[in-house]
Swiss-Prot record:
Secretion signal, residue range per the UniProt entry: none
NCBIfam families, A to Z: membrane protein insertion efficiency factor YidD (TIGR00278)
Taxonomic lineage: Bacteria, Bacillati, Bacillota, Clostridia, Eubacteriales
Domain of life: Bacteria
UniProt keyword Cell membrane present: yes
Places the protein is found: Cell membrane
Keyword Membrane (UniProt): yes
Species in which this protein is naturally found: Clostridium novyi (strain NT)
Function: Could be involved in insertion of integral membrane proteins into the membrane.
Membrane topology reported for the UniProt record: Peripheral membrane protein
Keywords: Cell membrane, Membrane
One CC-aspect GO term: plasma membrane
Protein name per UniProt: Putative membrane protein insertion efficiency factor
Family as reported in the entry's similarity comment: Belongs to the UPF0161 family.
Length: 70
């Protein structure tokens, strides 16, 4: 149940909020796509933790690059 709610929140963000902002994610796939993949693969709790860690790494001092869900 929580997994479905989180997925809908991320999809809402990607559809309605993300287009209003300039592209700023330093990683591929984007942080929101990474969060969707992590939650789908590992579930709500572990996937959310992975997504939070990824978002915290997404800043101007990190070079970014290719970083898929493993």
């Amino acid at each position: 149940m929580l997994k479905i709610i989180l997925i809908h929140i991320i999809k809402f963000y990607r559809k309605y909020i993300s287009p209003l902002k300039k592209p700023c994610c330093r990683f591929y796939p984007t942080c929101s796509k990474y969060a969707l993949d992590a939650i789908n693969k590992y579930g709500a709790f572990k996937g959310s933790i992975m997504a939070i860690k990824r978002i915290l790494r997404c800043h101007p001092f990190n070079p970014g690059g290719y970083d898929p869900v493993k």
